[in-house]
Curated annotation (Swiss-Prot):
Chief location category: cytoplasm
Species name: Pectobacterium carotovorum subsp. carotovorum (strain PC1)
Entry's Gene Ontology molecular function annotations: 4-hydroxy-tetrahydrodipicolinate reductase; NAD binding; NADP binding; oxidoreductase activity, acting on CH or CH2 groups, NAD or NADP as acceptor
SUPFAM superfamilies: Glyceraldehyde-3-phosphate dehydrogenase-like, C-terminal domain, NAD(P)-binding Rossmann-fold domains
Cellular localisation: Cytoplasm
Binding site for NAD(+): G12, A13, G14, G15, R16, M17, E38, G102, T103, T104, A126, A127, N128, F129
Matching CDD domains: DHDPR_N (cd02274)
Gene (name only): dapB
Protein name in the entry: 4-hydroxy-tetrahydrodipicolinate reductase
Length: 273
């Protein structure tokens, strides 16, 4: 085991993302796996977390309750479902544990709960932990300021057949970045579905299109289309390790923060560019 003062707990340790988070923790300096959790009733409870991730024995047994590992971790990483994440948030808030939240699909009440908890604990909450995606969001701001007022803006995203929310959290973050740069409210200008006779396109709208198919890890494109030319800014992920590495990097960063709500822009200092 690596010597480290930053102990990370992974929720959903047996899932695709959970296993890659465990691999990322093993590969990265400055962190160590402190705890691994699975949902109540999972057949993986009692398994060795390292073996689940294909790393060999780690000595960390998968548990079903945060109470059982309360003293074993400093930062919790959660890429699960909103209802589960909010329960984990309440625990981390109560016990003053930092949190990395990669879960998407929260309603306004869920987002408010995260914001409130961040008054007392450090939280990095992001729709996407890929370095490349967050650089793309910065580029979208720049493009929107230059050409967003006279182009048609469309966002197209594609993910694997098992993804349960649409549009993706990343696609929504792209829309928010563009809308903010243009002084628009995404809630009032977003168009999520077109069918039948829709009429002419509203020039102030931001359209979204969603694909769910096969094993696509994640593809996102923002299109700024004018008459005679268009600019497309695209990010394609070929492995979930890019998200896992970003989340662990965020865990290292948040470990020095007593409280506050942050995103990957803060972790990567993108606002300084």
């Amino acid at each position: 085991m690596k010597n480290s003062s930053i102990r990370i707990a992974v929720v959903g340790a047996g899932g695709r993302m959970g296993r890659q988070l465990i691999q990322a923790i093993e590969q990265m300096d400055g962190v160590v796996l402190g705890a691994a959790l699975e949902r109540s009733g999972s057949s993986l409870i009692g398994s060795d977390a390292g073996e689940l991730a294909g790393l060999g024995k780690s000595g960390i047994t998968v548990k079903e309750s945060l109470n059982a590992v309360q003293n074993d971790f400093d930062i919790l990483i959660d890429f699960t479902r909103p209802e589960g994440t909010l329960a984990h948030l309440a625990f981390c808030h109560q016990h003053r544990k930092g949190m990395i939240i990669g879960t998407t699909g929260f309603d306004d009440a869920g987002k408010a709960a995260i914001k409130q908890a961040a008054q007392d604990i450090g939280i990095v909450f992001a729709a996407n932990f890929s370095v490349g995606v967050n650089v793309m969001l910065k580029l979208l701001e720049k493009a929107a300021k230059v050409m967003g007022d006279y182009t048609d803006i469309e966002i197209i995203e594609a993910h694997h057949r098992h993804k349960v929310d649409a549009p993706s959290g990343t696609a929504l973050a792209m829309g928010e970045a563009i809308a903010d740069a243009l002084g628009r409210d995404l809630k009032s200008c977003a168009v999520y579905a077109r069918e039948g006779h829709t009429g002419e396109r509203d020039p102030k709208s931001i359209g979204f299109a969603t694909v769910r198919a096969g094993d696509i890890v994640g593809e996102h494109t923002a299109m700024f289309a004018d008459i005679g030319e268009r600019v497309e800014i695209t990010h394609k992920a070929s492995s979930r390790m890019t998200f896992a590495n970003g989340a662990v990097r965020a865990a290292i960063w948040i470990s020095s923060k007593e409280n506050g709500l942050f995103d990957m822009r803060d972790v990567l200092s993108l606002d300084d560019l």
